[in-house]
């Protein structure tokens, strides 16, 4: 009997445990065996072939040894298939993986695509006796990554030959691994979120609570100090604090994910029948046409295209939805400064937050109906004239449900006494708190707030021609048309709120009168910020610095450059060719010169794509 036959018998009798003791014989076997397969050979050559007989017995040839095992009835579930089961080959020894040459193509005929998964110690090797053969089920965890998927695609030759977790079944390990990445928590109580409700991820309980609260006139009162802890176990203990936290995290009526809006529009276009659906489809057609015209604008500074598109054709309901969808998120300061604050730390916190909010404010303005159709000069002028008013009304709205508190960010909530550390800050805090109290008394609605915020921006350039140092708007008629559209949307919403005719007119006047108080606060805040800049007590960021200097230095030198030269906004925010982009304010003015930056220094908004704290928030 040859050495080769004797070695095969030894392996069958004693198993792979003795392989390390017969290494000389193994070296001779390698010289007698067929040539090793290349790693680049097709995947089918790396696996044993199947020959299924009619008698219900399948044979697998491996290393010139034949092992029979019972095959199931063809009428039942197949023994293995492309999408349910895969072979898992084990090493010939328990101390290391098998070599690539130890697997050979035995037999002929077509082979089902199999996925090669490295074996683990709990898998039985093929070299065991026939009773020890196993076919692993799909409950074995298979973790796929983009790199692994690409390599398998290269081996199999097509994407259809690769296995996916969905095809392999709902395995416990794989399912848990995939779901772990997609697990979201309620922004209000930190319970598991059931979906995206009213603008934030929330659970079913908080969604239903917020729905009940905004539908009725619920005047909740906190029995304590309006600072109750709202979590999974204590969310029902205080309705007032729960509703306050809902507003703090950004819940609002009509808050819908943008991708959901697109899905709803598509479904309506597909299934809409009847007169009512035809009207809705007609309105959607106008909106799509409007968006298409907005995206087709070229980089000529907007071209003053207000006359090319009538914004008044958009219905009031659609205007309200656009305004609510344009709202920026609530930011985090991410500043680790200990209390009590000093003058320097307080101003550092506030200026840092203002600089972050300015970037989001520009993205918000670009989403307003008709704003991108204005010339670049008009866009810059409106933003420079109203930026602090817009930031202040946003601060007041966030603080409306927190008496005595100003919510600058989710992790930066200040009260009146904390403003004492900065000279002149207490007066500004008092005015902000008084206006927030007025908002609370009027029970300002989210729809009314977004309209007032847009009116502040568009009304800021109405009297620019009165100043000798400021160039007037190039297309004041287009700005006035946008302002009328927003005002009509506000009047329409008030008329649908159930007020009597006289009460409607009174409420319109009450809301619009608030804007004069906000303008007064803005002027006070601008003077205070400019005095702090002159004292060099706190460094100002480039964007905030240029916005501040825009109120002091207004001497136009050259016409706005084309947007193609100055648009460096992130791809997600460059939705229109005529919009404000990083660097556009300085480029359009050509006049910002301050003690901290020369005339040729990097301009105002050039951080749009490079600042990590703002890039995620600007994505659509």
UniProtKB/Swiss-Prot annotation:
Domain of life: Eukaryota
InterPro entries in alphabetical order: Est_rcpt/est-rel_rcp, Estr_rcpt, Estr_rcpt_N, NHR-like_dom_sf, Nucl_hrmn_rcpt_lig-bd, Nuclear_hormone_rcpt_NR3, Nuclear_hrmn_rcpt, Znf_hrmn_rcpt
Region (Hinge): 252-314
GO CC terms in record: chromatin; nucleus
Expression by tissue: Widely expressed in brain, ovary, testis, and female liver.
Skewed-composition ranges (Gly residues): 298-308
Keyword Zinc-finger: yes
Zinc fingers, NR C4-type class: 186-206, 222-246
Alphabetical UniProt keywords: DNA-binding, Lipid-binding, Metal-binding, Nucleus, Receptor, Steroid-binding, Transcription, Transcription regulation, Zinc, Zinc-finger
Domain NR LBD: 315-551
SUPFAM superfamilies recorded: Glucocorticoid receptor-like (DNA-binding domain), Nuclear receptor ligand-binding domain
Assembly: Binds DNA as a homodimer. Can form a heterodimer with ER-beta.
Protein name as catalogued: Estrogen receptor
Organism: Oryzias latipes
Gene (UniProt): esr1
